[in-house]
Amino acid sequence: MNKICAAGTGSFVEEQAARMGIPLAEFGQLALSAEHPAALGERCTVFIETAIASAAAEGVPQADIAAGLCHAIVQNYLHKVVGSKPVGQHIVLQGGVDYNPGIVAAFQAAYGSRVRVSPVFSISGAYGAALLAQEAVGDTSSQFVGFDSPAQAAEDSRSAETQRNIDFYRQADNLLLEGYTGKRDPRKKTVGVPFVLMIHKFFPMANAFFTSLGFNVVLTDPTSEETIRLSQQLAQSETCYPVKLIYGHMQQLIDQKVDYIFLPTIHTMKHEKSRVKHNYGCVYMQTAAASIAKALDIESKGITLLSPVFDLDFGQEAMASAMLGLSKILGIPKPFCAKALLSGAMAVRRHTAAVEKQGKALLATLRPDDKVLVLITRNYGVSDPILNMGIPELLLERGYKVITLSHLPGHALDIADEYENLYYPFGQHILSGAKLIAHHPNLYAVYLTNHGCGPDTMLSHLFKQEMGDKPYLQIEVDEHFSNVGVITRIEAFLNSLNHRPVEVLPKNFVLEQVDIRPCHLPAVPEKDFPLWLPPLGEYTASLTGYFRAQGVDAHALPHLSAHALSLGRAETSAKEYLPFPALLGGILAQQEVDPAPAQFLIPQTQGAEADGQYARVIRAVLDRRGNQSAKLVSPMLETLPATAQDRDALFRALLAGDILYAAPAAMRAGIAAAWDTLPGWAQLHKAAVEIGRCPATGRRFATVGTPLCLTELDSGVLSTLEAEGSQLLRAPLSEALWFLWKDNMDANKPCAKWLEQMAQEMQTIGAELGAHSTFAQDTAALFETADTILPHFAGGNGRYRYAKAVELSGRADAVLTLAPRYENAATILDMRGLRDACKAPLFQLSLDNDWDETAWSRLRSFLYYC
């Protein structure tokens, strides 16, 4: 079953047939008559509409579009629903969509004669439901008393045990709100608290702190339909659903005329057993409070935002310092705030301990035949009635015991040897919980993820690995969820559990004694195996030369092919950013050609975007496929100055690519041919001087984004613009990494002098390039811009991307930003006002390998008027 939504395949085909003026009864036969089915991609059916419109505009015959739609729907189903699950030799199609011979033929094109259509395909679901009902009733007589019986009958029939389970589950919410009254004394100022994100953890602290200082505290009600309406009306960017709901909650506080709104900025969050440098909240937690408060213009309404920056990696002292920093804004002496903070900290500790105690008590009282469902998600997803989609109540009403991740001792597990670079504390907790559930024979997971959440796209793969063969229910939350769809999935999952035998706990069973499978991704390649690098445009040759200079047999993978991307996408299940299936598919395609042991370079970052997890998740996918011959080499980008075998040579390799991109396209091949595989300083400076002598012509477009999108995954957009005579001012990769290294100076202090030397080299080469240079003349100004707009931010090198776009906009006719579609960091830059900060018009290229004529039309229209 799809974890996201009802398939809607039949209704979608019907809708598109109507748009194209094709009678539905004729659609399938028309598709069968196609000679060249249109390539419409394999995205969610809703997004295929754009591809259909583009194909029609290009004059593609209706028959080819109809056939392309059939293939696209089938491929989307196979990749998003079937995924990597094993498919047997006998495949039966069922469902009303089988009336369409085009869809049937598309399935047969994928699986051949293994596919057969059920003779009762249109009613097979109803027949199966009837069989399940018959099985459930058995020999007992029916208790059905009619559809018009009072609703109270269902309530009265609820067993005492079910009611106890419901009461138990609700205790956690009661504990969170303990001591909260919501009353407002008109003589006091009021602090409004939106019931969102980490407030579901820190509310006891906030309530005790502000109440002790003499303020009224008002917590917004749990998310309602009105909250959703406000959020949809006010949200200015396409964020994940939990962040979008902040708009509605803040607006409700504005309507209540509070004096302050309290929502902390979560930069880092401590996890007891973690060994990563920093444990980050996601990129939204680092920026949402300030971004949304600005979007709603709360200051003009007389409301002050209280958003202390929580750097909890540095312990309670750092949190205390952040909260005490509010004393000046509130006009209250620090000693009074310190006393109030003590009350708040104690409230959080009491709540955490009480919830874990609850869980231990329940697990200790389980009967041998009890199956307990564990709701796995972040704390705000557990409590919010919209984000949990009413699932806890649906499970409880069906007689199951339900607990949450907080009831399990996940914080006590040390999984660092298995997940060395898992910098999301909630991710560490989720995977710890997965281990406990997989280990306990009678615990089963209900795993809720969020649509549009970058971290969830990676964690879902690791969660799947942890659960192994044990069944679990995963549902993705978004604002369009259907109650019927949720209930259908729950019923199917519970039915499968009912057919699983209950296992007796082994004697002396210890829940925390789980398997840890160490997984180390080396930063340095071995010399015994070839090393394959992902293609990176003009940087590829010099980076290959860098590794060869270290004695490594290095090669570059081919440019991304449709086949390689298809292999990678077959292993995706959500909205993974484009570089993930591209990198994975490149490895799988190369292993098809040569399955011999080989190394593949997939760099890591220290957070907080999803890209830092690519290497670990690709390793998990390869392990699940039984592919041990593919070894990953994963250096940490932030610490390369301290760990690279020859940092001078590495920086020269980066500069070589930057110099080639600065040159007019017609000069590049000649310059590269004159170089050694890894050019020396003299060769670099000579080339820069040569380029600087050439006149710079054409309109100037600045391009800023992620490295792969700027080089390999832009669908040929940038090379086309260059071929048409435009000059592209590409953000230099050497400067981008230099900025990242300076941003992490605590790890790179021994390299401080070297970093200054490299800054001087960039300045010199920039001067030599003249009008072709894209290096910043004043690197300090880059940091000043970043510190003003994104002072506490880690993820996707977003600080540099923001500052560089602003800097380049002063010497360009337009700014083009390139990022994978759905990338959270790109959304953050938009929310933080990048478009307004730039001195030239800005166009966002949101890339997912589906650039088409419609996209070109939008871009060309923008460039014409800018």
Language model region names:
Residues A72, V81, P86-A110, F121-S122, ...:
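Glycine-rich phosphate-binding loops at beta-strand->alpha-helix junctions
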Residues M1, R43-T50, V97-G112:
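Acidic-glycine-rich active-site phosphate/pyrophosphate-binding loop
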Residues M1-T50:
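Glycine-rich phosphate-binding/catalytic subdomain of phosphoryl-transfer
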Residues N2-E14, M20-I22, L132-C866:
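An N-terminal assembly and electron-transfer interface module characteristic of large anaerobic redox
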Residues R116, V120-Y127, E135:
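Hydrophobic helices that insert into or interface with lipid environments
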Residues T50-H79, A794, G798:
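Adenine-nucleotide phosphate-binding core of ATP-dependent small-molecule kinases
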Residues E26-S33, G68, Q89-Q94, V117, ...:
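Beta-strand segments within the central parallel beta-sheet cores of soluble alpha/beta enzyme folds
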Residues N2-K3, A38, V60, R114-V120:
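A short glycine/serine-rich beta->alpha loop
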